[in-house]
Structure formats: C-alpha cells, structure tokens
C-alpha cells in the first residue's frame, strides 16, 4: 500500500505540526507506515516546542501525489488550506476540530472531528483507545499544541477536555504546563525579527465565507504597538496579496496574549463587513476587538454571518 503522508494545513501552527508528528507516531506503532510532513515554514513558537522536546521538524513538501497515493489530514479539512494537489490523492483519514467546508471525497474515509480546542486533545484519546503508550517527547508536543491553540487555557475554544488532557500530558512530559506554556507563547510572540511578509503569512488561512474569498491571518504579541508601528508596510503587502489572490477581504488579527484582546486590521472590498461582524468602527483600517482571541470560534463565525 505504501507510505501514508500525514500533514496539517498550510502556514502551519503548533497544533498542525505537533499533531502530524504524533499521529504518524501512533500510526507507525499500530502497524501503518506513515510519515509526518509539513506544508510551510515552522514558526518560532513551534520551534521552541520542537527544541525543548528534542524533536526534528517534519520535512517540507509542496506536492503529495508524486510520492504517495494516500494522505491523512490533521487540524484541517478545507481543501484550499491543504496541499496543492489534494485532488490527486486519496484522503483516508481526517482528524480535526474545525468546521467542515469545501471538503469532498470520492471514497469513504475515517473522519473524526470533535468540538474541542485542539486536534492534540483528540489524539490523546486515540493513543488510549489503541492502548499505545505516549512517550515523553510526544506528550510534550501534544501538550504544546493544546497550550498554543487554547492560549494557555484562556481561549473560548478551550474545553475541560483540553485542560484535562494538557495536565495528563504535562505529567508524562515532566513539565509545569503554566511555566512551560508561558515560555512557549512568549517565544511565539517575539515578532522583532519577522519581516512584513512573515507577519501576514505565518498563521494565515483562506476561507470561502458566503460568496466572498477571505483570508484571515493571526499573530500573537505582547505589544500590539510593535506591530502597528509597521502598519503602512503591512497594508502595502496585504494589498499585494489581495490583488494576487483575488480576495474580497483580508483581516490581520493581532492578538495580545497578556490582555486577551485583539486588534483587527481589515482591507479589501468587504472590509466594512468587519464593522458589521463585531459592532465596531474601523479607524485607519483598524478596530479593537475586546475579548477576541480565537479565529475559529470568534472571528470566522462572526464574519460568516456578516458576509452571508
């Protein structure tokens, strides 16, 4: 049957990378030849986790069909977020915690999606269901994914299942989740060396919302002003992306991980829909979104309603 490739979405975050590594590990331990790969560059937060638990980053691929017939998707399902030749391979499994959209297969598959804060929380269960011991390093990566997606348990996407799983995994990994978690988040929030291009692509996802083509990028920081100081250059680069991709709306969500608020920078023909979605007024193309930290649970649903 050959090797199955396991990967998450483009512009990978910590859950995408760590869940791919963990699920490939589980598949191999139950007798399925699998390899974790990635569709983009590793961000600073994820690199911190990989270094801390002494794990190698998965290798980068641009296409999958040239080396396998079967793939497993983790942490995503929407085809525009996946590998470019997704239509040329068979998706045999999906393990995810997002909405289902723009997803169709020609053959039956194993599809597992749960309303939890992180794919890693589901994988923690799957190790138990398969009676496979989670090694210390894998536990550390799964913990890192949960901390990342839940913003150290502060995000509205975080469930009790995520918190319980994180504490189980922290015990196996031998770390204090609060201390380790804050160090990891701070590593990801250091934007001082990031180019403008990196700021708007490091965690960007494309969505079809209503009849609109929308891209939502998110960066975490401990100082929003550090990002807005570069607003002119950021807007120029965003406008290039809008033109190149034919986007109706690009929203950069700049999240303060200490205050748990975000600043939205919105550009494009549908930028006014951000005002409708969040009951705010854009000034200089920006608006403060109080208490908004989750793209999945707070930004995408609000924009979906506004654009429908």
UniProtKB/Swiss-Prot annotation:
Instruction: Copy out the cofactor comment.
Output: Binds 2 manganese ions per subunit.
Cofactor requirements of the protein: Mn(2+)
Where, in this chain's numbering, is Mn(2+) 1 bound? Answer: 9, 13, 75
**Top-tier EC class:** hydrolase
Keyword Metal-binding found = yes
Give the species.
Bacillus pumilus (strain SAFR-032)
Swiss-Prot/TrEMBL keywords: Cytoplasm, Hydrolase, Manganese, Metal-binding
Q: Please give the coiled-coil regions recorded for this protein.
A: none
Which InterPro entries does the entry mention? DDH_dom (IPR001667), DHH_sf (IPR038763), DHHA2 (IPR004097), DHHA2_dom_sf (IPR038222), Mn-dep_inorganic_PyrPase (IPR022934)
> One Pfam match, by short name?
DHH
Tell me the name of the encoding gene: ppaC
Q: Name one GO molecular function term.
A: inorganic diphosphate phosphatase activity
**Any one GO CC term of the record:** cytoplasm
Q: What is its EC number?
A: 3.6.1.1
Known Gene3D superfamilies for this protein?
Answer: DHHA2 domain (3.10.310.20), inorganic pyrophosphatase (n-terminal core) (3.90.1640.10)
- Give the catalytic activity: diphosphate + H2O = 2 phosphate + H(+)
- Location within or outside the cell: Cytoplasm
Q: According to its UniProt record, which protein family does this protein belong to? A: Belongs to the PPase class C family.
List positions binding Mn(2+) 2.
15, 75, 97, 149
PANTHER family linked to this entry: BNIP - RELATED, MANGANESE-DEPENDENT INORGANIC PYROPHOSPHATASE-RELATED
Q: Report the protein name in the record.
A: Probable manganese-dependent inorganic pyrophosphatase
Metal-binding as UniProt keyword: yes
